[in-house]
């Protein structure tokens, strides 16, 4: 399920499967603490939970999106492993610098380069998954492990140096 009347772009099945297969190949999900920032429907965080993550925090500033996240968590039987937070992404990262193992970063495609820089500087994670309409320059603090284009979507996996 996706939030109604919203310009949400749920990650396609093929992109999601390839992304999570890459995370699985690194052993990154088993027992992991995951942050699904710009959660939308929660599909990415729910996929992480279904593949062995111990906990996922879903952050979005749209209450309708968060209602959908809660419904999707309930429908999959994963509600006990999910924490749903209404907040603007950068404000959340500034207030709660809790370290996570994997951060799933799928902001709106209109997200600019400066916003990406701020986001990557603020997130406290070992690995990040970046989803965008273009290749993102991650800066010197990160090492890109994998980057692949799927039509209009570019997904990169990066590790903190």
Q: What spans do the regions from the language model cover?
A:
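Class I S-adenosyl-L-methionine-dependent methyltransferase catalytic core
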Residues: 1-161
């Amino acid at each position: 399920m996706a939030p109604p009347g919203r310009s949400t772009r749920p990650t396609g099945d093929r992109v999601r499967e390839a992304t999570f297969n890459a995370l699985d190949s690194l052993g990154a999900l088993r027992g992991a603490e995951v942050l699904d920032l710009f959660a939308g429907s929660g599909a990415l965080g729910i996929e992480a939970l279904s593949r062995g993550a111990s906990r996922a925090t879903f952050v979005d500033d749209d209450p309708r999106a968060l209602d959908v996240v809660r419904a999707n968590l309930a429908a999959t039987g994963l509600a006990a492993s999910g924490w749903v937070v209404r907040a603007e992404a950068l404000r959340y990262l500034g207030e709660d610098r809790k370290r996570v193992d994997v951060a799933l970063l799928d902001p709106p495609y209109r997200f600019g380069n400066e916003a990406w820089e701020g986001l990557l500087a603020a997130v406290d994670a070992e690995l990040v998954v970046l989803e965008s309409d273009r290749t993102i320059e991650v800066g010197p603090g990160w090492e890109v492990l994998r980057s692949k284009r799927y039509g209009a979507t570019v997904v990169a996996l990066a590790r903190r140096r």
